[in-house]
A protein has these predicted regions:
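A charged, aromatic-enriched C-terminal amphipathic alpha-helix characteristic of glycosyltransferases
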Residues: 344-370
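Carbohydrate-associated surface elements
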Residues: 154, 174
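Conserved donor-binding/catalytic core segment of Leloir-type glycosyltransferases
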Residues: 195-211, 217-220, 233
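Acidic donor-binding loop of glycosyltransferase active sites
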Residues: 272-288, 301
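Conserved acidic donor-binding segment of nucleotide-sugar-dependent glycosyltransferases
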Residues: 317-318, 322-328, 335-342
Length: 370
């Protein structure tokens, strides 16, 4: 098939861009011709909460893309329509996670030839920023699609409450292979400058209010009572002020047991943080699905996750990870239990589940349902 994929790609950074790259590489590896249409302007600076939207390092194996789409400029949308019609595409795939994209995506899907199948991969129903009229913008986007694909049952359920048409395909979050595989633990600790005698639990990714970092920090004193040599790694760029977290750490007198790497981690270093850790902690208050869970499975590190929709779909308590009910006390109990347990069975189950979460299976499921 001739397939056009529209979304953020290099030089844009982050999980959506990384996922789009793996999507295209997998389609190409399965014999499809793929053209990539990238954003020239994605977020206006005033709406972007982070330090930069762009990668600081050059991708070694970069896919060619046409940087055309400007979310604020309808003339760029017309250029995209002309480009796609000229490519004689069989299928368009757009990737959606925020209502800001709805007008341009709807326009493109509406005015591209009716012979082209339009599919949307939906990461979030409502963006993390919870902007006004987001549900209406989602409906607009969905009206332009022949089929939509979700990465979790949770997202499918949310869409069905808003939009009654039954043209959805519920799939899964494919595991990200581009970041490599699990590395030797001692080697990883040395490379990151960590003490090889200590054990580490990891909080990884963008720091936002809903991600529950405060609960994790509050759980640390009880964790340290049982596991005095454990260290908490807080690794990721903040999208909110870090002041309250530093104040809480000082108040609890646990600064010697916490290491904060407050920056966006380059792709080639991600595997070392996961490979250094005994557990990955995901104490979110809400989740569509979690790219961090997918990373943890890729690197075969057990997770301790909130028992909420979007996370518990992939995690079975004491089988493929650990679940807790979002209190600092219960989180401490669960982490202490996990640290004392023989986690070989958990890891073996993760390895088994990994085989079902491949890009090839993801793509095959989409194409057989269109």
């Amino acid at each position: 098939m001739n397939i056009v994929v529209i979304g953020p790609f290099y030089p844009y950074r982050g999980g959506i861009s990384d996922t789009n790259k793996e999507l295209c590489e997998s389609l190409i590896n399965n014999g499809h011709k793929v053209e990539i249409i990238n954003f020239k302007l994605l977020y206006p600076k005033v709406l972007f909460p982070g330090k930069t939207q762009f990668q600081k390092i050059t991708e070694k194996k970069n896919l060619k893309s046409y940087r055309i789409v400007n979310t604020l400029n309808p003339f760029s949308w017309i250029r995209v329509v002309k480009k796609i019609n000229g490519l004689k595409a069989d299928l368009i795939i757009t990737t959606y996670w925020t209502g800001l994209l709805s007008p341009c995506y709807y326009f493109i899907n509406k005015f591209v030839s009716n012979k082209v199948i339009k599919i949307g991969i939906i990461h979030n129903v409502i963006s993390h920023e919870k902007r006004l009229i987001e549900k209406q913008l989602l409906k607009l986007y969905l009206k332009g699609l022949d089929k939509y694909v979700t990465l979790s049952k949770n997202v499918s359920n949310q869409i069905e409450k808003i939009y009654k048409k039954t043209n959805g395909i519920k799939l899964f979050h494919p595991l990200p292979t581009k970041f490599g595989v699990k590395e030797n633990k001692i080697k990883s600790k040395k490379l990151l400058g960590l003490n090889i005698k200590d054990e580490y639990i990891l909080f990884f990714g963008l720091i936002r209010k809903y991600k529950g970092l405060e609960i994790l920090i509050n759980s640390m004193p009880k964790i340290l009572e049982i596991n005095p040599n454990i260290k908490l790694l807080i690794v990721g760029e903040n999208y909110i002020s870090m002041k309250k977290y530093y104040q809480l750490i000082d108040k609890l007198n646990i600064s010697s047991s916490i290491i904060i790497k407050n920056k966006f981690i380059d792709n080639d270093k991600i595997k070392y943080w996961f490979s250094s850790s005994e557990l990955v902690v995901i104490p979110y208050s809400k989740a569509s699905q979690s790219g961090i869970t997918a990373l943890s499975f890729q690197f075969e590190v057990p997770t301790v996750s909130s028992n909420i929709d979007g996370l518990k779909e992939l995690i079975s308590d004491n089988e493929s990870g650990y679940l807790f009910n979002r209190s600092a006390n219960e989180l401490a109990l669960k982490i202490n239990y996990a640290l004392s347990a023989d986690r070989k069975n958990i890891i073996n189950n993760i390895i088994r589940i990994k085989k079902e979460l491949t890009w090839e299976k993801f793509i095959n499921q989409i194409l057989k349902n269109i």
